[in-house]
């Protein structure tokens, strides 16, 4: 089905959808995710994802690495992380293990330092802490819509440089320096810089969404100080509590989010408790700005 049809067509299959927050997030009940899921259910899941931005499935304890990858193929083309090795025995799975300092506790959209970054991510909880370790998502389309008109008009014209080479220590001051350095060396084994429009047009819904997060290095055409101020103002609208949803993980939960219209933050409040999640990302499109210009990679190496 075409993007336009997916956005507008009525869907014969009605999922059991329960909104979690007012502007973003819904739990879908009564669906057992698998590589054998029927086409009508897959289509309905795709439509729910575009509408709600992030969707949750409880109790998917039957999934293993292979079936997670197999299910992902129903939603798009899985792609591995550009710099971080995959889990042994898999082609695409990225593991985030809190015990290894892999705690994504800053606001970001996945892999925006590349040109055509993933359109969606599928995250499975393998080990969940007894308390803490929630993830929060923000609706970047709602954030754009709530901007005052003069600020929207400015944002429409802005471009930002995204990179995987940034100040890791300032974002993660509590992580063991040796672990942090090991992570940095792997994460920046290839350094990318990509210019994205600050406002991208969603290829299915047509919504405009802010394209920011911690991979932003600077706003083009502004001094570093002005760039930081502009970023803070716009990013502050993204992370307003009214634009967010928070999910309390249980082992076997699956979250799927539209990476073109969200940011997320893994809350690092679980101490030494174990927390392991595994993620598959799906190939995305090169973002298009309000003026029709495409994102472009300016550095790779």
UniProtKB/Swiss-Prot annotation:
**Obligatory cofactor(s):** Fe(2+)
What are the protein's UniProt keywords? Dioxygenase, Iron, Metal-binding, Oxidoreductase
Q: Which Pfam families match?
A: TauD
- Extract the InterPro entries matched here: AtsK-like (IPR051323), TauD-like_sf (IPR042098), TauD/TfdA-like (IPR003819)
GO MF annotations in UniProt? 2-oxoglutarate-dependent dioxygenase activity; metal ion binding
Entry's family note: Belongs to the TfdA dioxygenase family.
The protein's name is Alpha-ketoglutarate-dependent sulfate ester dioxygenase
Organism from which the protein derives: Pseudomonas putida (Arthrobacter siderocapsulatus)
């Amino acid at each position: 089905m075409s993007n336009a049809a997916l956005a507008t067509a009525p869907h014969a299959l009605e999922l059991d959808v329960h909104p979690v927050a007012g502007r973003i997030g819904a739990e879908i009940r009564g669906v057992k995710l698998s590589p054998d899921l029927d086409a009508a259910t897959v289509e309905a899941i795709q439509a729910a994802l575009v509408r709600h931005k992030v969707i949750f499935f409880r109790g998917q304890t039957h999934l293993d690495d292979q079936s997670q990858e197999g299910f992902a193929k129903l939603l798009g083309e899985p792609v591995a992380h550009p710099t971080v090795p995959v889990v042994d025995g898999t082609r695409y799975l990225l593991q985030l293990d809190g015990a290894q300092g892999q705690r994504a506790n800053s606001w970001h959209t996945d892999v925006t330092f590349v040109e055509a970054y993933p359109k969606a991510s599928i995250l499975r909880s393998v080990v969940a802490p007894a308390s803490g370790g929630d993830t929060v998502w923000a609706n970047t389309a709602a954030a754009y819509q709530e901007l005052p008109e003069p600020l929207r008009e400015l944002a429409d014209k802005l471009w930002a440089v995204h990179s995987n080479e940034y100040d890791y220590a300032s974002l993660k001051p509590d992580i063991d320096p040796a672990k942090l350095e090991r992570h940095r060396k792997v994460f920046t084994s290839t350094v990318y810089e990509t210019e994205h429009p600050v406002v991208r047009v969603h290829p299915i819904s047509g919504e405009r969404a802010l394209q920011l997060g911690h991979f932003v290095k600077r706003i083009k055409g502004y001094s570093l100080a002005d760039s930081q101020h502009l970023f803070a103002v716009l990013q502050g609208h993204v992370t307003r509590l009214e634009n967010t949803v928070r999910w309390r993980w249980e082992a076997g939960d699956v979250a799927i989010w539209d990476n073109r219209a969200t940011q997320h933050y893994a809350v690092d409040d679980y101490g030494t408790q174990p927390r392991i999640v595994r993620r598959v990302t799906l190939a995305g499109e090169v973002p298009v700005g309000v003026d029709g210009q495409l994102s472009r990679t300016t550095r790779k190496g």
